[in-house]
Amino acid sequence: MTTTRFAPSPTGRLHVGNIRTALHNWMLAKKHGGRFLLRIDDTDAERSKEEYVHAIRADLAWLGLEPDGEERQSERLEHYEAAFEALKAAGRVYPAYETAQELELKRKIQLGRGLPPIYDRAALKLSDDERAAKEAQGIAPHWRFKLDHDVPITWEDRVRGPQKFDPAQLSDPVIRRADGSWLYMLPSAVDDIDMGITHVLRGEDHVSNTAVQIQMFTALFAAQHDAQQSPPEFAHEALLVGKEGKLSKRLGSLGCDAFRERGIEPEALVAMLARLGTSQPVEPIADRQVLLDTFDLSTFGRAPAKFDDAELERVNTAIVHAMDFEQVKQRLPEGIDAAGWHAIQPNLATVDEAGEWWRLVTGPIEQPEFSDEDRAYLAEAAETLAWDDDPWGTLTAKLKDSTGRKGKALFLPLRQALTGMNHGPDMGELLPLIGEEEARARLQSAADQRGG
């Protein structure tokens, strides 16, 4: 069974980049009838906050990306300890004693010589006595995973195609800090094995991590004496950039809370992000099944995916315009019925704007100043107004015949007097909602304005 996971760290709110990753993992699983799991990567006890765990769950629920299961790394520490000891027994992890300052100095020296900043494995050259001396001085070791330099790392990436890394050009990653806490690499691999993850879909900034983790998977399988297992399939999607094509701090701060405050529908955000970075056009598709049916990793491109806020707003507007009254009635101001919704709907960019447009019906409105000629015209309109199945059509037809007005001269003063605006909902739908008595009063009020 296809099983994917979304593994955020609860050190902040989800932003648009990892929302997209969560969505694509959900889509990959659901397209194939599989499972989408949530893993909370909370091994960093100092930075992880419970409030962010709740926020992550709430954001996924708002987006309709309900996980089929959840794990928390903070509750699985014994599994990482067991894996660590197994790798240690197999000679695949080793202690290192350099301080952060010493490592940074080595890095600067390598860069100054035009060399890649790869860890030099100095710790492997220490004798038992030298290690004992460091620990006697109170220097606790951190631990690195020892890459096998004799075996090239290869995999078929579902987005990037064939990948090949020379492990000698990679640093042995630190997997455990001197205080005993875990870094990302080992817990992630252990969890992927235990959770039965079949596909890892993540950003291209993880490509080198994948190269390391493939060897880690192999080492863990060997330690478990399970040579039949193989690592998950990997897919690395292009990073999200602003519409100018640059990485943007703003994208890193754009989260579900910001989108909700702006009135963006979850369906719009899903429709936008589902196809962003693929060869398929972004369209206002609210039907998840349509998006799932067309989801295909082979359409994912290598170029950075450009997130355009204006495009999201266009998608949102189109989706709002297609929403049924039943979908939104609980979110509308009191008094708006199906007829009211359909009257104002074409003018909405967000559902939240419904209240503003509904005030054209409930009032009060602010009328502009009219010329003497228009005031006389509106006085005639107040007398002419007759209530039938189509009061707007009847009124404008009679006024056209009696005054000879047409076009803007016929319609605009009426709209301004009845709504206080130069544009807005279809008056044929709006006028019956205003009602005969109120409509006549507004026309008469405009006609009774004192001349300037």
Curated annotation (Swiss-Prot):
A GO MF term: ATP binding
**Subcellular localization(s) per the UniProt record:** Cytoplasm
Q: Which domain of life is it from?
A: Bacteria
Q: Which parts of the sequence form the motif 'HIGH' region?
A: 8-18
Keywords of the record: Aminoacyl-tRNA synthetase, ATP-binding, Cytoplasm, Ligase, Nucleotide-binding, Protein biosynthesis
Signal peptide segment: none
- Enzyme Commission number, as recorded: 6.1.1.17
Q: Which GO terms describe its cellular component?
A: cytoplasm
Q: Which GO terms describe its biological process?
A: glutamyl-tRNA aminoacylation
Q: Could you tell me what reaction this enzyme catalyses?
A: tRNA(Glu) + L-glutamate + ATP = L-glutamyl-tRNA(Glu) + AMP + diphosphate
Q: Which Pfam families match?
A: Anticodon_2, tRNA-synt_1c
Coiled-coil ranges per UniProt: none
Q: What does this protein do?
A: Catalyzes the attachment of glutamate to tRNA(Glu) in a two-step reaction: glutamate is first activated by ATP to form Glu-AMP and then transferred to the acceptor end of tRNA(Glu).
Similarity comment: Belongs to the class-I aminoacyl-tRNA synthetase family. Glutamate--tRNA ligase type 1 subfamily.
The UniProt entry, under NCBIfam families, shows: gltX_bact
Q: How does it assemble?
A: Monomer.
HAMAP family attached to this UniProt entry = Glu_tRNA_synth_type1
**In its UniProt entry, what is this protein called?**
Glutamate--tRNA ligase 2
Whichever gene encodes this chain, its name is gltX2
